[in-house]
């Protein structure tokens, strides 16, 4: 069984020391789903939302969030991300927007939290921009899809 890397031998929260690790290319992909009414989704897709381009705003918010993950999650390292991508795809038959984020760097620690934060904040931005027209929007299935690089190896969600 694995141990918690962020807890020291006294049981206290602790930032992991990565100074002895080798640099490698690390990449992570995450997703979030945002479910809403057909009318709200159509308003977003057609560009008729009174607040502007929901997808563009959510994309930028996700990218900004990935870059600030270390500032939001206390034990995350500040990272020099070399790539952040956020894509938003309407899934009309399910009244959803599927958000997928990708983060990449060459470094000593992984980028899973950055990818998860990007997808989460993009989803929250959609909610924020659309809450005036629909309050019961659901954000769900925020999850890591894939990670590679580093000593823990390659992970792909089932």
Curated annotation (Swiss-Prot):
- Any one biological process term the GO annotation gives: Mo-molybdopterin cofactor biosynthetic process
Question: What does UniProt give as the signal peptide span?
Answer: none
Detail which positions bind substrate: 75-77, 113-114
Q: Tell me what reaction this enzyme catalyses.
A: (8S)-3',8-cyclo-7,8-dihydroguanosine 5'-triphosphate = cyclic pyranopterin phosphate + diphosphate
A Pfam family the protein falls into: MoaC
Quote the EC number: 4.6.1.17
Question: Keywords on this record?
Answer: Lyase, Molybdenum cofactor biosynthesis
Can you tell me where the transmembrane regions are?
none
Q: In which pathway does it act?
A: Cofactor biosynthesis; molybdopterin biosynthesis
UniProt entry tagged with the keyword Lyase: yes
Q: Active-site positions, per UniProt?
A: 128
Question: Record's superkingdom?
Answer: Bacteria
**GO terms for MF:** cyclic pyranopterin monophosphate synthase activity
Q: Which Gene3D superfamilies match?
A: Molybdopterin cofactor biosynthesis C (MoaC) domain (3.30.70.640)
Q: Per the similarity annotation, which family is this?
A: Belongs to the MoaC family.
Role: Catalyzes the conversion of (8S)-3',8-cyclo-7,8-dihydroguanosine 5'-triphosphate to cyclic pyranopterin monophosphate (cPMP).
Self-association or partners: how does it assemble?
Answer: Homohexamer; trimer of dimers.
Protein name as annotated? Cyclic pyranopterin monophosphate synthase
Which species does the entry assign this protein to? Pasteurella multocida (strain Pm70)
